[in-house]
């Protein structure tokens, strides 16, 4: 190889490297909106920490499920150190390790979820809370598989040992979240699951009997449909978790103030605690 060809080849390699590692401004901005999720045991000690993102301006967020298992409460910490309490679980899936939940936050600037899947060879960035002041790790998509006919399962050209073992948020070059990473063996490529699947999670009337949600001390949110919400309220009345019943009955009254079911359930709850003035 002569000197001219060597210089051309070297320039091509450098250009490719720079293009791969250069961080678009939208990616750097989005990475600063990755927040810290902290879950706590019943005694107040920390159970686990992970990363999460808000998906709407009303305090809805997604993360992996694992930190919530066995948790009595949870908080989110933003980049300024401000904490927000997780108030309700909006859904969970053990197989794909996803959780969707509601916080007390409002008027939050959410992260946009990519509607189109990324393709093999596409540049992506792996971000976490406090990730070097918004400087995520660059990678590329190695391969993409499809599950449930419409969601993407990504394998990256990045090994688990090259970044933190915690779950991170995966962004495309437009600063849109495409997935949440899964911790993998150090010798294996890092995997990520489509964030759109987390958005699809929801509760049902039978969520109180869900073996996954039953391991979480944070109450589930009422289902959107009234008949399913009533079913959840009825099942809550048969459980021994009085705090959960109080939360569900209060939510039902807030959503359906003209229906008597929530009031009667809450009255029975107060009577069971001999709080007759509250039941009146």
Descriptions of predicted regions:
Residues 1-25:
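Bacterial Sec-dependent N-terminal signal peptides
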């Amino acid at each position: 190889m002569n000197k001219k060809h060597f210089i051309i080849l070297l320039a091509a390699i450098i250009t490719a490297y720079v293009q791969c590692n250069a961080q678009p401004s939208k990616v750097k901005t989005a990475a600063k909106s990755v927040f810290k999720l902290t879950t706590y045991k019943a005694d107040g000690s920390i159970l686990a920490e992970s990363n999460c993102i808000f998906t709407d301006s009303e305090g809805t967020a997604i993360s992996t499920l694992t930190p919530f298992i066995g948790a009595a409460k949870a908080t989110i910490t933003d980049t300024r150190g401000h904490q927000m309490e997780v108030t309700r679980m909006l859904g969970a899936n053990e197989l794909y390790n996803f959780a969707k939940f509601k916080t007390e936050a409002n008027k939050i600037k959410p992260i946009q979820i990519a509607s189109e899947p990324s393709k093999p060879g596409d540049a992506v960035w792996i971000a976490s809370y406090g990730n070097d002041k918004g400087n995520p790790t660059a990678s590329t998509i190695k391969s993409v598989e499809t599950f449930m006919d419409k969601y993407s399962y990504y394998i990256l050209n990045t090994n688990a040992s090259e970044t933190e073992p915690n779950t991170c948020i995966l962004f495309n070059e437009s600063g849109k979240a495409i997935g949440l990473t899964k911790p993998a063996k150090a010798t294996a490529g890092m995997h990520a699951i489509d964030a759109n699947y987390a958005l699809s999670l929801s509760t049902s009337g039978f969520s109180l009997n869900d073996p996954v949600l039953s391991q979480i001390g944070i109450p589930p949110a009422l289902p959107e449909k009234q008949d399913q919400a009533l079913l959840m309220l009825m099942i809550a009345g048969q459980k021994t978790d009085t705090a959960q019943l109080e939360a569900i009955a209060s939510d039902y009254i807030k959503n359906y103030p003209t229906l008597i079911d929530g009031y009667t359930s809450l009255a029975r709850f107060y009577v069971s605690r001999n709080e007759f003035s509250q039941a009146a």
